[in-house]
From Swiss-Prot:
The keyword Cell inner membrane does not apply. This is Oxyopinin-3b. Keywords: Antimicrobial, Cytolysis, Secreted, Toxin. One of its GO terms (cellular component) is extracellular region. Expressed by the venom gland. It comes from the Eukaryota. One of its GO terms (molecular function) is toxin activity. May have cytolytic and antimicrobial activity. It is found in: Secreted.
Amino acid sequence: GVKDYFKKLLQKVINKIKSFRKKQEA
């Protein structure tokens, strides 16, 4: 459904932000 789609999309964004922060810290 639409909710599942947005949940997956949100997780992708969160993962990108987390990986981006790790690169900034390094």
